[in-house]
Amino acid sequence: MATVAYKCPNCASPLTYDGTTGKMLCAACDSQFDQDTIEALNAQEEAGTVDFVAPTEEYSASDAAHMQAYHCKSCGAELITEGTTTATECPYCGSPTILPDRIDGGIRPEMVVPFVITKEQAQQAFEGYFKGKKLLPNIFKKDNQIAEMRKLFVPYWLFDCNAEGDIIYNAEKKHTRREGEWEVTTVEHYIVRRAGSMSFENIPVDGSVKMDDKITESLEPYDLTKAVPFQPTVLSGVMADHADVDADDCEKRAVERVESSMINSLRNTVHGYDSVSVRSKNISASGGKVTPVLLPVWLITTRKDDKVYTFAINGQTGKLTCDVPTDKGKAFLWGAGAFAGIFGLAALVLYLLKMLASGTMLMAGIVSLFAALIVVFTLIGQLKQAASKTSAAGYSTEGCQLHVQYDRFLYANTTRRKIESQNKEAAA
């Protein structure tokens, strides 16, 4: 039988169990720890795995009788629509080489979110996008014509699961005081533990290899309470993509967002420290369920200098995202201008208050720099560029339920620094 050796989080010396107190003791530094904290510290970091229950219902013979499949020879898209709808071009690449095919298997969607945004509204959203964007490249300043506009149902997998998180942090509190000609700094070291659980419903991951995850995640959220049961008639006049990325492959992305949400939620419960770092973590998920759905998207492309740019619009809410780049030259000029203006105003105020010391000017410069960066990032945000989501917090049903909240002081160390006299500073 293997022997497990536990080490002190403070000094790394061996720990022994004290039957009287029920705690783990360190003979080297006299620290005491609860058993569950030491067990958590020694737990391996491991990514949570979920056994999601994937759907198995395929299109029925009745569905197939009322539906038409198409195959794009250009990009390989596998598409379906209602039987009376005739497709003349691929909604992804615009190719006219789209051939009729037969419905041959495929997971049947359980729900469909209908289109609310009309073609005219989507076109207005595209045209309005270019107004007031300070960091748009000059090529978008005029003649923004729609090259192609397509109405498409995109296949998604919706993931439900429960998550458990247990994280140990190293935390510090820093205190500085003056004792005569000495500056004394004391750093207190703590071990902090947080454990909790979260439940998630309907985390969407698109099941189309042809749709960039950054675009589909930027279109969130959809109001799934407005979804209707799938029937072939729902596809009348609209193409729908076959899910060519299965639920097992999409599971990883859902779990990544769940883990990130769990980590962020537990970290947000740690307060009152000057610095906090993760010492160890254990995140797991369970009870997974998967639901296949179709969600509405308008795809619009425009061509500039022989390059195609894509705009995607949430067909339910009208939310827009795109792959338009930032004009870096304009971003620099706006940042420099904002810095100069803010710093100049701060310098004027300090001059009027007769506070033009080197320390105050340095602080004014730092504040001006941060303010200028805020201006630039605000302007970049106006471009609505597609970006991946980093969490699934919006799909949590109750937020984080905290089960363990543990803060224990470990030790403190003190440093002393001699302060140069004001006379010496003035002479220098």
How should each PLM-predicted stretch be described?
Residues 30-37, 94-101:
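Short Cys/His-rich micro-motifs in 6-15 aa windows
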Residues 335-351:
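Canonical alpha-helical transmembrane segments of integral membrane proteins
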Residues 13-16, 34, 80, 98:
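Short functional micro-motifs and their immediate structural scaffolds
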Residues 8-11, 26-29, 72-75, 90-93:
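Short cysteine-rich clusters marking metal-coordination/redox-active sites
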Residues 3-5, 21-23, 65-69, 87:
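Residues immediately within or flanking Cys/His clusters that coordinate Zn2+
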Residues 304-327:
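Juxtamembrane amphipathic/hinge helix adjacent to a transmembrane helix
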Residues 20-25, 38-44, 83-89, 102-108:
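Short cysteine/histidine-rich zinc-coordinating motifs and their immediately flanking basic loops
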Residues 107-308, 328-329, 333-334, 355-356, ...:
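Charged, low-complexity helical/coil segments in non-catalytic cytosolic or luminal regions
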